[in-house]
Amino acid sequence: MAKDSSFDIVSKVELPEVTNAINIALKEIQNRYDFKGSKSDIKLEKEVLVLTSDDEFKLEQVKDVLISKLVKRNVPIKNLDYGKVEAATGNTVRQRATLQQGIDKDNAKKINNIIKEMKLKVKTQVQDDQVRVTAKSRDDLQAVIAAVRSADLPIDVQFINYR
């Protein structure tokens, strides 16, 4: 009897890469002419990014700089969940962006439905914050990977432990 093959679908953000991107973005903000004298800042508090600036326009520019640096460091931007812009101390505005780690129940159901619609002989299991896909045929697993990649999910997914 042939051994089953499997892989895990996960959604992770590498925190050291996020820290590196923040440091590079802060250097650019300090050196840019249009940010001279502004109180623009980016901080990482556990898994929440806190963006601070003088006004909403500059806050959007800070966000654009940060996003460009995150993209260069291969950090998935889909996993950033931005909150509302709120007033902070000293005539500044603040916005929080939460880093989403893992696959929540709703997205796990969406992934499950995508795989079930393919009508292949594969089994899926939701394990905490990841989805395990098992099948006898590796070709079926490759088809599942292609389908999940092409699906329009609200989070970025990675495929690990391919056996």
Curated annotation (Swiss-Prot):
Pfam families: DUF520
Keyword Nucleotide-binding included in the entry's annotation: yes
SUPFAM superfamilies: YajQ-like (SSF89963)
Keywords: Nucleotide-binding
GO (cellular component) term, any one: cytosol
GO molecular function: nucleotide binding
Top-level taxon of origin: Bacteria
Function as written in the Swiss-Prot or TrEMBL entry: Nucleotide-binding protein.
Family that this chain belongs to: Belongs to the YajQ family.
Name assigned to this protein: Nucleotide-binding protein BC_1159
